Amino acid sequence: FKCIILIMDINSDNNSGKKFNFDSFSNLDFYRNVNSQLLDLADIDKSKKIVDLGCGNGGITEMILSKVSDVSKVVIYAVDSSSTMISLALKRFGDRKDVFINYIQSEAQNLHENLKEKVDTVVYCNSIHYVPEKESVLRQIGDGLSEGGVLAFNTSFFDGAHPKETELFLRKWMMKSLRVLRNEYNIKPVKSKVQSRIQLTPENYEDIVVKSGFSVKKKTIKNIKVPLDGWYEISSFKDWIEGVLPGVPLDIGKKVLQDTVTNLFKELNISTLDRKWLSIVASKS
């Protein structure tokens, strides 16, 4: 087992970060399947040096290792801005003696400063929607790729991600949540537009990819049946709470969103609610 840990100019997470992180959601089977499909789309088994950008608890890294034919010939750079997530990833692979993983704590926009080696593939799962300067970050990613290197990313935050038949459910969910906030907590969200809610169309994403020096090789938009667990667990995630209920204290937002979505699933007698995922695989031009 070989491991290099690089901690880069990011403050350690506090306890609230641990309480409201992405960990519980990222372990759900449906979500793992979404990311597994992206790795297959990217032909990940052909790469030897791979960046898992926004690695979280190491779930994607683990999936990458399961898809390559010889892990001893693969180097993975597991990158995340959160020290909590880096710690979870470290723990996940603590017993693996056969893999070479470099852990780098860094924001996506600072990766070029913290990783100087050229790589074959950058995998960027469900995070690109948080980045304000997408073109700048993608250009930096391209600069870090070998000639013909691959960028693979996905997101469920884009214009058109909600199928029309789900709009009534989502409106009801928000109405119920706002009612509970008003009646039980005397709180209402503040008007705010966080980055993940400034949504681009799939065509916008393609244009940005091309302008950043890539050629789009594959693009898919898939309808995913998200179970109640998915909506329940995403409602414990800080960025989701701040996105749908900006200004509401996280602990209150979490409880309200989880209670109302659970009740609404029961009320409507449904087991899943659809959401679309956009996946793009591009090569360095």
Question: Which residues does each predicted region cover?
Answer:
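Conserved SAM-binding loop and adjacent beta-strand
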Residues: 21-37
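Class I SAM-dependent methyltransferase SAM/SAH-binding core
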Residues: 51-53, 57-110
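C-terminal helical/coil "lid" or tail adjacent to the Rossmann-like core of SAM-dependent
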Residues: 16-17, 217-271
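A short SAM/SAH-binding and catalytic strip from SAM-dependent methyltransferases
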Residues: 121-134, 157
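Conserved class I S-adenosyl-L-methionine
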Residues: 152-182
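Short alpha-helix
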Residues: 197-212
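A short glycine-rich, Lys/Arg-flanked "PGG" loop and its adjoining helix->strand segment in the class I
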Residues: 135-147
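A short acidic, Gly/Pro-enriched loop at the edge of an enzyme's catalytic core
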Residues: 113-122
